[in-house]
């Protein structure tokens, strides 16, 4: 402590405070987190020590850097980390006053967060408290993930204690189901929704309503200025079934994020785009729709081949300013992995050219899926009622006391420790990475049983399928409305009429509409300027 000079207190929590300090020798600013140990039980003290040990073992450019740590005469534990001049993401959103961030900036933040989260999961670490106030920003607007007070090393396949911030908790935690790394993906999805929309993904006046919204994965539409690809990625992170959520590594390999991944300083070769060799260009190719876990085969008929060729030409634009250039390649029998260098201006131009094609590809798949699969309305209503049924079991001191006012709007970090560990079965949850060590987590409240239980939490696969079909219909409608709005704004009335023709009295098949719309989008005109962003 003698090496540091305290400048001011910059934060206060339930168990300690944060101070801005200056290293006397280096004359460099750091943040010192001081955790009170006096009058705390042994489990809490072990948690503080293990947080210090965990921070010392982490090393990633997008995680706050550990500087020093010690125990001050047994009364408090001190952890010194790097100082981020840009504040936290929650403050940045408030200062924006409703002015939305540019998509390029959001995607850059998103990629950095995924790199940090993938690093944690590869090292068997669950963060368990991902929220905007724990996402810090440097003066260069780069991400630093912070606050590992609730983090856990997975000794078993899954965790079972209920910890975190209610607004960012995933359905399986609230349903008292053992959870794994996909719980962090849900929390990050909530953060990304808040960064995009400048409002929480899930917000309610009371805990029961909040749980109901989370259990139904009921979110409002995101701002229309962002691309469908980005919004679909965020939606995929907020799927109720954890098995249907992507991992951080899978998201990093998404084609839409590849340009931003190439700009990162810790880009691993396993995340670089995979390009097929020339010998395979004529074969059938399998592609994944942006922001979705469903696969579709691109058939070798005239219209689909034309669409695929146009998309490839638009992405692989090679003019005076090179969009993508190969730096080094590692050859394999079927494909080669290529590192890429990116020109941001050329990248934006190329994405502008293929924006209509990408949107059409999503509409085509969703419309064809809905046409082929008819939905029984009675089953649909039953599935919705089943997924929205909530049973809240109050426990004294766990969530809210009877005499207290409703939960305030600000976020509250809660935790309920289960005394008896449940036997974890692999087939009841998504697979996760094996662990070797266990970090006991001390939380604010403890109870023999969890405070929140959801009825009908063990949904059958058939119910998941029905809900997925409903989600597909919603995605298709949203994509269709976005395209119609864009065509109307550009006064492309003939194309707009072609899009809406299948819904008239003399409706034609979705396939005929897809072929017609493909031809009309082969040479898309230049889009008008987008709204001014920050």
From Swiss-Prot:
Reactions catalysed according to its record: L-seryl-[protein] + ATP = O-phospho-L-seryl-[protein] + ADP + H(+); L-threonyl-[protein] + ATP = O-phospho-L-threonyl-[protein] + ADP + H(+)
Q: Which domain of life is it from?
A: Eukaryota
Query: One of this protein's GO BP terms?
Result: microtubule-based process
GO terms of molecular function = ATP binding; protein serine kinase activity; protein serine/threonine kinase activity
Record PTM: Ubiquitinated by the E3 ligase DIS1. Ubiquitination of NEK6 leads to its degradation via the 26S proteasome-dependent pathway.
One of this protein's Pfam families, by short name?
Pkinase
- Look up the signal peptide feature and give its range: none
* Protein location: Cytoplasm
Is the NAD keyword given for this protein?
no
**Keywords (A to Z) from UniProt:** ATP-binding, Cytoplasm, Kinase, Nucleotide-binding, Serine/threonine-protein kinase, Transferase, Ubl conjugation
Query: What is this protein's record name?
Result: Serine/threonine-protein kinase Nek6
Q: Which gene encodes it?
A: NEK6
